[in-house]
Amino acid sequence: MGETLKVIVLIDRILKSYRPLIAIPAAITVIALLLVVFNGLNESVDLKGGALAELTLEKSVTQAELESLLREKLGTGDIKVLSIRGERVTVQFGTDMDVVKVSEALRGTATINSYKAVGPVLSKQAMNQIYWAIGFAFLFMSVTVFIIFRDPVPSLAVILAAASDIIIAVGGMSLFGIPLSLASVGAILMLIGYSVDTDILLTTRVLKRRKGTINERALGAMKTGVTMSIAAIASMAALYLVTVFVMPEARVLSDIAAVLIIGLLADILTTWLMNLGILRWYLEVRS
């Protein structure tokens, strides 16, 4: 009981000034947006095409060693070893490389059995449709949230927090070199749903419930929401560690886990700082 009172007192002190609550995630969102604009996003072979090579190893090498060798010799970082099974290796190139140069880079390490260019799984038109789908998802989500709360300010706060969450996740992809792929797009779509869940949890507890003070209601929502987020982050961290150190060929899973970890961490900031700060300001003005 004593610890709970201490937490409530701490939250009371923090909520006395709601501006820093809004400013911190807002600043991180702007930085993430600048990262995407100026640093850009790498596109995976799924989206831009490339080449696949089937190799036979002449000596034992690890996946990391082979990738490092090819990147150094060919002068490009867009190379991925998809699988190593005994002496058989499959390598993915982000661009259609000159097969002679690839063969020279592999001299003494492996020989090329087959080499073929591959087209993108999704065309630019299909990707544009995905972007439109994300936009419409936000639109319909906005309408649904407005119907639930019947008030534009809490509804806009939920949408703003969800949008900031996605922007920070995409900024993290740019910062850590996680490529935009079918897997990462799927992870972003999952984040939209998760972010809205925690935002609606907070907004419902603070606005709909009448028992307790605003801060006590916020604390109750925070206990549930942060517990959910920590559990999800822990499971994604376990998946990431397993795929990186135990199953390095499962790069798709590690990319999904990395995007979700970044997004879930961002969701803690956008929900429990930004959204809570906006709601605190709104209730203060309304009263």
UniProtKB/Swiss-Prot annotation:
Pfam families: SecD_SecF_C. GO terms for cellular component: plasma membrane. It is a multi-pass membrane protein. It comes from the Archaea. The chain crosses the membrane at residues 21-41, 129-149, 158-178, 182-202, 226-246, 259-279. Keywords: Cell membrane, Membrane, Protein transport, Translocation, Transmembrane, Transmembrane helix, Transport. It is found in: Cell membrane. Gene3D superfamilies: Multidrug efflux transporter AcrB transmembrane domain. GO terms for biological process: intracellular protein transmembrane transport; protein targeting. Involved in protein export. Part of the protein translocation apparatus. Forms a complex with SecD. Belongs to the SecD/SecF family. SecF subfamily. This is Protein-export membrane protein SecF. It comes from Methanothermobacter thermautotrophicus (strain ATCC 29096 / DSM 1053 / JCM 10044 / NBRC 100330 / Delta H).
